From Swiss-Prot:
Alphabetic keyword roster: DNA damage, DNA repair, DNA-binding, Mitochondrion, Mitochondrion nucleoid, Transit peptide
Location relative to the cell: Mitochondrion matrix, Mitochondrion nucleoid
One Pfam entry name: Mgm101p
Organism per entry: Saccharomyces cerevisiae (strain ATCC 204508 / S288c) (Baker's yeast)
Name of the protein: Mitochondrial genome maintenance protein MGM101
Residues spanning the signal sequence: none
Cellular component GO terms held in the UniProt record: mitochondrial chromosome; mitochondrial nucleoid; mitochondrion
Amino acid sequence: MKSIFKVRGCVSHAAQFCQKRTVVSTGTSNTATAGAVRKSFNSTETKPVFATKSEAGNGSHMKEYSSGINSKLGGTPLETRSTADDSLNNSYKQVKGDIDWYTSWYGLGMKPFEAKVQKDLIEPLDPKDIEIKPDGLIYLPEIKYRRILNKAFGAGGWGLVPRSQTIVTSKLVTREYGLICHGQLISVARGEQDYFNEAGIPTATEGCKSNALMRCCKDLGVGSELWDPVFIKKFKVDHCTEKFVEHVTTKRKKKIWLRKDRQVEYPYK
């Protein structure tokens, strides 16, 4: 009798083990996540499994991704487009008449803005707001673009929407954005930002967005003088100077540009 109970216990234990074991199968649907899908016999839930390093290196579309990113993301883009099925835990519902700014070109070139708005947009820049890089490139800080847009359209009257996935290569983050003002698509531009290690990717995505905003503002005439060769030369003569400096650590000497009202800063002296 004891031996019979022992055999039944072993059979029951084996059955439980078989129910809990998992298998790995490849997805066949076009909408499936890249890589294998892990399925459980006692559950209908499926979870994506990231590709291994060897799998990630096989695809030609993954060659531009760094090996570290491949191991974590399976060679997929950093971000993907949200849909009505996965946005905000399925709380989003498509409303008739909604505009999908990811693909729509609604309002582009449809009508001009009011005269006051146009005046605020093309207002000449204050020389005090313009900065210059050590290599001589003049630019307007990104926050100044936002202030100009807020002044012209009002806070909440404009926005920047993604128009593509975020692409991460071994050294660069890039994504396409569209500028929406008062319900109209104004401009589309691709932002880009370099990064030096994978820890800097989140910061690079924000820099990519800022770069796209600056490029979109060119179509509104914001800071248009920054691309005018005559203005650039005059600004450098009136407000900037060149100085020979020495790098604190490498001891190398070079000539850099800086504003006349600024002092040489670290790492130069």
